[in-house]
Amino acid sequence: MVTVEEVRKAKRAEGPATILAIGTATPANCVNQSTYPDYYFRITNSEHKTELKEKFQRMCDKSMITKRYMHLTEEILKENPSFCEYMAPSLDARQDIAVVEVPKLGKEAAQSAIKEWGQPKSKITHVFFCTTSGVDMPGADYQLTKLLGLRPSVKRLMMYQQGCFAGGTVLRLAKDLAENNKGARVLIVCSEITVVTFRGPSETHLDSLVGQALFGDGAAAVIVGADPTPAEKPLFQLVSAAQTLAPDSCGAIDGHLREVGLTFHLLKDVPSVVSNNIEKCLFEAFNPLGISDWNSVFWIAHPGGPAILDQVEDKLGLKPEKLRATRHVLSEYGNMSSACVLFILDEMRKASSNAGLGTTGEGLEWGVLFGFGPGLTIETVVLHSVPIKPGPH
């Protein structure tokens, strides 16, 4: 008779969890950041609030965002005037949209990842779905399973209401699953739409206005598995992962799901809380590897906003090019909450290949992925890049 220990050893993978494919998707509706204040104050019937509009214009100008994608079009907002008020009961209407559109956008990203992966979808053993946009039962994980036609026996995990750190969380959990279940192939989907957070401006709650200037819609999907087959093409290895709460940061970032939708609350000192705690996270992650030069690794940091990136850069003495991929995604898409770091991974491996660099991590061997969000929670994932094989000339 076999022992429990023998069963356990037989289930373990040999090598580290590896990202095998990445896919992304956005809604068709694209909004230009430079003209967004005019549109936002018009659609919310707030044009008489001229000082507040000027303040919002400055927020948008300083955001380092060029454009964003949003499911909420002018037509949808006109059909749902309660969305355009600051605190009007509107959760039912918001939920009606979110429970359909969040899985649908996630499906687009997942199909893109599955196509790149090149394996039959029947080989997907686990599904993680992550969103801060609406809640439902059965969840978006169930809806995605149905939309993609995955096996009924696929093992699902639904993560609601985690916020901006969760792109790191899903990689941490997928790593543990892939390494402890031989042959596992985990489909991760992070899908976020601003239908739950969009609201009119308030002169007394400027943190809500910050969210209106930063947040965008997007979905990203990755496939994670250990011991890649010859037919699979590894992109990054997941070496270690940690989560920590920054000390004395209670209330720094909060979100509350209420009759009025998801309200967003942010303290001014969030950039300094992140920058003051990030080196400790780096040291704990990289000390075992003998790495202490933060410019020697490639960087994927959740772009909560330009102030966070600027302070992290300054505190650690990072060269400007270290956060190029991060700033590029912020500029092109805005803050897409949990999906952002996966978009940045995609941008980095593509840019590395296009530039003819030696690895998926900008030619470097080791890298770090950071998620920052409510708590204040910091997710730290150590990545190892993969050599890029030169394509046929």
Swiss-Prot record:
What is the top EC class of this enzyme, as a single word?
transferase
UniProt cross-references to PROSITE patterns, sorted A to Z: CHALCONE_SYNTH (PS00441)
Q: Name one GO molecular function term.
A: naringenin-chalcone synthase activity
Matching CDD domains, A to Z?
CHS_like
Any GO BP annotation: polyketide biosynthetic process
- Pathway(s) it belongs to: Secondary metabolite biosynthesis; flavonoid biosynthesis
**Keyword vocabulary terms for this entry:** Acyltransferase, Flavonoid biosynthesis, Transferase
* Reactions catalysed according to its record: (E)-4-coumaroyl-CoA + 3 malonyl-CoA + 3 H(+) = 2',4,4',6'-tetrahydroxychalcone + 3 CO2 + 4 CoA
Report the superkingdom from the record: Eukaryota
Q: Which InterPro entries match?
A: Chalcone/stilbene_synt_C, Chalcone/stilbene_synt_N, Chalcone/stilbene_synthase_AS, Polyketide_synthase_type-III, Thiolase-like
- What Enzyme Commission number does this protein have? 2.3.1.74
Q: Where is the active site?
A: C164
Q: Which Pfam families match?
A: Chal_sti_synt_C, Chal_sti_synt_N
- Presence of keyword Transferase: yes
Chain's role:
The primary product of this enzyme is 4,2',4',6'-tetrahydroxychalcone (also termed naringenin-chalcone or chalcone) which can under specific conditions spontaneously isomerize into naringenin.
| Similarity comment: family membership | Belongs to the thiolase-like superfamily. Chalcone/stilbene synthases family.
User: What protein does this entry describe?
Assistant: Chalcone synthase DIII
Q: Source species, please?
A: Ipomoea batatas (Sweet potato)
